[in-house]
Amino acid sequence: VRRPAFAFSAAVFFSAIPLLSARAIHAASPGKKPAQAQVLNSPAGLTEVGILDAAAYRIDVPANWNHSLVVFYHGYALRPASFHIAERLSGQQQPFFERHYAVIQSAYSQTGWALQQAYPETESLRRYFVKKYGQPRETFVAGGSMGGQLVAITLELNPKPYLGGLDLCGSVGPTYESFGHRFAMRAAFDYYFPDVMPPLVPVPADFEDTIADRDKVLTALRSNPSSAALMRNLTGLHTDLDLAHDIAYWTFVVADMQRRGGGNPFDNRNYIYTGTSSTSSASDLELNDKVKRYAAVPQARAYLMRHYTPNGHLGRPMLALHTIYDPIVQINQLALYDHEVQAAGAEENFVQQIVDREGHCNFTQNEMGDAFDEMVRWAHGGKRPTPGVLKQ
């Protein structure tokens, strides 16, 4: 039975340029000692927290450790993540720990679309773990939302330490594609609902994705049902509530990338808008004629392309799990990565599966655990999982 989308959480979400790839790998520093390290032993196992490379980290080793490791990447965070040593491991990491794997995770030294920081900082943490706790028998990589993109990055740039990876609701594929789509949709919203949201280029530096912002958008949508319907059709979102959330969230994401790139990295001048109506092309024509067009700043565009344009060369098996409807990481944005993997000749290392549920990362513990088990069997030389619906 399909369930409705649950409340959205704050944690959501390079062509791999060889120079940057090598720099990111070598930036990892296993020789550094962590700061503020604390260790707690309990009947469940050992937990260590601290600061490494300016990023908070957490290590969990179960009492009945199988001497294998899961390197975990969290998703897009609007606010800094932190770890509390006395808190029990939960969420997306729990199925791995329950299967007797050690789990390590970095909070990253920056919030937002922190691929530039997350990848080397997590690799540094992996090396620290190996140095302190010993070489694991096997190592897997997993992550949710933006963390799913980091799983793909890891298996493209540095597959050697890993046997396989699990991408949970991951925003995989070229950043310019998924974020450029969000930018274009925000521009379309401004045409239908002018002066509701702050300027798009540049987004004010102090903009925050708040409940008040979402309520403001929702009020505007409900005041003009015909334009709201055009926007829902255009974006593929099911409800005004989903659309209101995304308009505010997309604005924050655009601001994040403008800050990181040192200017606006998005360009909708050549974007052709389609899909506002299933019965007529007139509204598409009107939107394309009247929507405001923006040009990208070259240096900002270059940053967007570096972080990250995949090469598709998955060096290890990767299983991707998604809900059938995800208003944050939309399914129709994921096909391009599959095409890139096929073009790279790595299609045998990539499988996508879905569950019959709505919402972003809205999986049960059993579903995540079953998907992980499938991936491990596959990585051990077993049958390649069947694409489509996850079988339990």
What residues fall within each predicted segment?
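Primarily recognizes the serine-hydrolase "nucleophile elbow" in alpha/beta-hydrolase
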Residues: E138-Y191
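Alpha/beta-hydrolase active-site loop
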Residues: A114-Y133
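Conserved alpha/beta-hydrolase "acid-adjacent" motif
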Residues: I328-Q333
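Accessory cap/linker subdomain of secreted extracellular hydrolases
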Residues: A37, S171-N311
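Short beta-strand element of the alpha/beta-hydrolase
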Residues: H67-G75
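Histidine-bearing beta->alpha loop at or near hydrolase active sites
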Residues: F350-F363
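N-terminal cap/lid segment of alpha/beta-hydrolase-fold proteins
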Residues: G31-N64
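Short beta-strand/loop motif that positions the catalytic acidic residue
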Residues: A320-H322
